[in-house]
């Protein structure tokens, strides 16, 4: 399975970066300001008595955040630093935070807007935490940041307009410290930084192919180039494309996935080390701690530790590994009896599962023998160990891992996906029977936790006097209403770039949308009519 590849000599010449209309993004001088940018002295909205609706000091931590709002007219997005709005986007704009994948920190944000004088009728700019423009570019650009290198990607232009569905365009790499553009090989449309190497996916459209026709041999017309920052190429793979390892990319920062076409409908997935040249075929996925799984020639599966010198084999399986946490692997088997199994790496015991669900830090497994367990993904510690009393003729289950050892279960005794019983379990066993909520709410979703770590939920119900409208109630772990009548509410994942405090969610109440705590206090809010492009359309946010 292991192959060591021949590396291209350092004397090879790479193509120079072309800052032209067809294959690059021309840097423009900084603009004078951001249209629609908020003043540093933004006023806090007040209630009828003149009392501020929120204390801006609560979120005054200097971190970039983004508040998304949606309504019938489309989307509107606000970029904030701490609790200070920097920019409220028009509906024709695209704005987003730019996270450095190496640090997980976002110190910049990107904005693109309509401009008839720009390439494809669009322009793009990068801004810092103060709202000051750092760089601007022709065209509609997407951006990623990797170890201080800004990677820009632009869709293909045809007759002055973008054709994003073609899947190929151009890319550019800029060193933010110096503003210098790094060499990019001809045909490059994406770039991934692996260690000190740049991995480019490239494509050449066949001559004579109509601009709007699909390239039926696109797999054969792609290739991958790995090169040094100075442009020296060190490796090339034909009929291939490269993909960053999005999960556990810090531990395996020198590795990249290569998909190499071996036939008209067959592809080899390869885990490639840009520093050593090692290649492992049959690659499936990576797991925490630098582990990876592979398929073998005899139809089995291997789990290997890619951080060790010999890439040590941990275990071999008959079924495909789905998830890993210390001491265990979740496997998936297909066919008529498809489903999950919990594999004990120490004993080799396999336990059939009804369902499995993972949060950022825990993984919950509900076994067909009735046992319900929640483990820590960090160390494999057992957080919850209880037994579920099944409903009569139980056929399936819907499970939601609420974190901290809590699990929401919907038990079904039919094949129509109708729920028979709804229960909440935790470290102490059964917490509450919430079956009665089924008659009141069209659906109930996990929202956040209360200050004691117990889960809270958001239930959607019909608004009084409305045939189609809905309102939302916030419920505690016992199903009691804590907040009612919200126009919207939605949770945030703990790994969100917004980095909000605990026990906070996005909500709309009345004519304001923003972030609220479980006591109903705003941490930040803005009028749903505050955007110049809102057209007086009600919105909801997250």
Language-model features, listed with the residues they occupy:
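C-terminal motif of bacterial Sec signal peptides marking the signal peptidase cleavage site
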Residues: 20-24
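Bacterial lipoprotein signal-peptidase II cleavage site
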Residues: 26-34
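Bacterial N-terminal signal peptides that target proteins for export
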Residues: 2-13
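Residue-level detector of conserved, function-critical positions
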Residues: 33-542
């Amino acid at each position: 399975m292991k192959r060591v590849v021949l590396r291209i000599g350092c004397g090879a010449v790479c193509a120079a970066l072309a800052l032209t209309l067809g294959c690059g993004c021309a840097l423009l001088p900084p603009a004078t300001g951001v249209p629609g940018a908020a003043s540093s002295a933004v006023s806090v909205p007040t209630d009828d008595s003149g009392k501020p609706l929120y204390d801006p000091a609560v979120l005054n931590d200097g971190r970039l955040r983004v508040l998304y709002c949606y309504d019938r007219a489309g989307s509107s997005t606000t970029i904030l630093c701490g609790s200070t709005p920097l920019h409220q986007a028009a509906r024709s704009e695209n704005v987003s935070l730019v996270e450095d994948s190496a640090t997980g920190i976002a110190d910049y944000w990107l904005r693109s807007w309509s401009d008839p004088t720009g390439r494809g009728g669009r322009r793009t700019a990068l801004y810092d935490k103060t709202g000051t423009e750092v760089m601007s570019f022709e065209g509609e650009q997407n951006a990623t940041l990797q170890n201080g290198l800004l990677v820009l990607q632009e869709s293909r232009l045809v007759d002055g307009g973008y054709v994003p569905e073609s899947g190929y365009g151009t890319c550019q790499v800029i060193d933010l410290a110096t503003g210098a553009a790094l060499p990019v090989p001809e045909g490059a449309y994406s770039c991934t930084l692996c260690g000190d190497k740049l991995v480019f996916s490239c494509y050449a459209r066949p001559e004579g192919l109509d601009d709007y026709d699909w390239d039926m041999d696109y797999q054969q017309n792609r290739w991958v180039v790995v090169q040094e920052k100075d442009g020296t190429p060190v490796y090339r793979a034909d009929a291939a494309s490269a993909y960053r390892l999005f999960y556990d990319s810090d531990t395996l920062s020198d590795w990249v996935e290569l998909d190499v076409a071996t036939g008209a409908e067959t592809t080899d997935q390869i885990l490639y080390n840009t520093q050593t040249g090692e290649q492992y075929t049959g690659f499936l996925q990576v797991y925490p701690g630098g582990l990876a799984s592979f398929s073998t020639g005899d139809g089995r599966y291997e789990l290997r530790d890619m951080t060790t010198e010999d890439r040590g084999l941990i275990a071999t399986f008959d079924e495909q590994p789905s998830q890993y946490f210390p001491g265990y692997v979740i496997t998936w088997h297909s066919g008529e009896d498809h489903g999950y199994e919990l594999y004990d790496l120490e004993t080799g015991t396999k336990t059939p599962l009804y369902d499995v669900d993972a949060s950022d830090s825990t993984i919950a497994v509900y076994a067909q023998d009735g046992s319900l367990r929640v483990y820590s993904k960090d160390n494999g510690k057992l957080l919850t160990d209880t037994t579920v009393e099944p409903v009569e003729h139980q056929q399936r289950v819907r499970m939601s891992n609420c974190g901290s050892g809590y699990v929401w279960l919907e038990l079904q005794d039919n094949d129509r996906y109708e729920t028979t019983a709804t229960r909440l379990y935790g470290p102490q066993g059964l917490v509450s029977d919430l079956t009665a909520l089924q008659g009141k709410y069209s659906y109930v979703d996990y929202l956040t936790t209360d200050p004691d770590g117990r889960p809270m939920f958001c239930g959607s119900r019909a608004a009084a006097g409305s045939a189609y409208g809905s309102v939302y109630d916030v419920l505690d772990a016992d199903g009691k209403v804590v907040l009612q009548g919200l126009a919207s509410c939605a949770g945030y994942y703990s790994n969100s770039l917004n980095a909000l405090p605990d026990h906070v969610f996005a909500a709309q109440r009345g004519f304001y949308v923003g972030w609220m705590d479980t006591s109903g206090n705003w941490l930040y809010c803005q009028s749903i009519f505050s955007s110049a492009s809102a057209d007086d359309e009600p919105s909801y946010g997250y």
